[in-house]
Every structure is written in structure tokens, then in C-alpha cells.
Regions:
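Juxtamembrane helix-loop transition sites at the ends of transmembrane segments
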Residues: 45, 51-54, 124, 163-165
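Acyl-donor (CoA/ACP) binding surface of acyl/acetyltransferases
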Residues: 1-33, 65-168
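A short hydrophobic/aromatic micro-motif that marks alpha-helical segments and, especially, helix-coil
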Residues: 14, 42-44, 57
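Secondary-structure boundary/capping residues
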Residues: 40, 59-62, 125
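Conserved GNAT-fold acetyl-CoA-binding loop/helix
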Residues: 30-52
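A short helix-loop-beta-strand connector motif used in the catalytic cores of GNAT acetyltransferases and
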Residues: 52-67
Length: 168
């Protein structure tokens, strides 16, 4: 069982009873704008995704996605490691709109990175976002990533202006 605790947060594995919170956290405007493939229009869509994600926990093929909970049990978002090409990985994260601007993403990503990088046996991980997603960029910068590329690139199947960061 994956379990990681910080001062304010717990990062653990998904359970089926989290579907409602995952659904609700995915509906904010920033999710629709920046990560539209992570919007779950129904609780059933969220439950199906949780079912798939929990099937990935035994291995290292990914995606490896873990919910972020506050100490009082509120599901505020997730952190993830997603495989790219040729043994490379990308970190991802999302904090639901009702919980943003509290430093949860930075706290979760800072704690998650060393643990997941060790689990995967990697010494480098990327972070990619739409260039205009300033909040996501700030999280990566606070977590020690350096900007590697900014310009046109593919993002969620579309040509967009992206920022690609790397942490070694």
C-alpha cells in the first residue's frame, strides 16, 4: 500500500468510495481549460477511472496516480507519474478548485517526487503544462524543476504553447 504523509496531507491509493470527490474535483473551470481529459462528467466515469488506476498499483508501467487527502480526510486532488517515451516519466498533479491557493500542490509534489522516482528507478522526471498555466508552472519551479523548453508542442492531442520542465 502506498502511503505518504506530510505536515498537512496524506497521499495514498484510490478506493472506490472516492469517486464522488474525484468527480467533483474535476469539474472546475481550470481543469476543463488545462487538462480536459481529466474531467469526469459523472460519478460513474470517475469510478471507472479509479478502477483502472487501482489496477496499476502493483507494477511500474503506469500511470501511477494517487489521491491527495487533507488530514481531516477531504480529497483535494491527486499526484501522478505518467510514462512518456523511452523510459521517461512525467509528473502531474491537480488540486480541485475549492482547495487551490493553499500550497497543497507544492507540498504534495515535493513529498511525492523522491518517493516515486526511487520506486521507478529514475533520476530525472519531466513536468509539462500549457504555458499560460501559471499556477502549475509556479508549483514546478518551487519543487526544483528547471525550464527545458517553451513553445509549440503537443498537449493532450492538440498543438498548444507548452512549458516543459525537468527535475534531475
Amino acid at each position: 500500500m502506498f502511503l505518504l504523509e506530510t505536515e498537512r496531507l496524506t497521499i495514498t491509493e484510490f478506493t472506490p468510495d472516492m469517486a464522488q470527490a474525484v468527480h467533483m474535483n474535476s469539474l472546475d473551470e481550470d481543469t476543463r481549460r488545462f487538462v480536459p481529459d481529466e474531467v469526469f462528467e459523472t460519478v460513474e466515469d470517475a469510478a471507472d477511472t479509479i478502477d483502472f488506476l487501482t489496477s496499476q498499483y502493483g507494477g511500474t508501467e503506469g500511470p501511477l496516480v494517487y489521491p491527495v487527502l487533507t488530514k481531516d480526510g477531504a480529497n483535494v486532488g491527486y499526484v501522478q507519474a505518467v510514462p512518456l517515451d523511452e523510459g521517461q516519466w512525467e509528473v502531474g498533479y491537480h488540486i480541485g478548485g475549492a482547495y487551490t491557493k493553499r500550497g497543497y500542490a507544492t507540498e504534495a509534489v515535493s513529498a511525492f517526487l523522491p518517493v516515486i522516482m526511487q520506486k521507478l528507478g529514475i533520476d530525472k522526471i519531466s513536468g509539462i503544462c500549457v504555458s499560460e498555466n501559471l499556477a502549475s508552472r509556479r508549483v514546478m519551479e518551487k519543487c526544483g524543476f528547471r525550464l527545458e523548453y517553451e513553445g509549440e508542442g503537443e498537449y493532450q492531442g492538440e498543438k498548444r504553447n507548452i512549458a516543459r520542465y525537468v527535475k534531475e
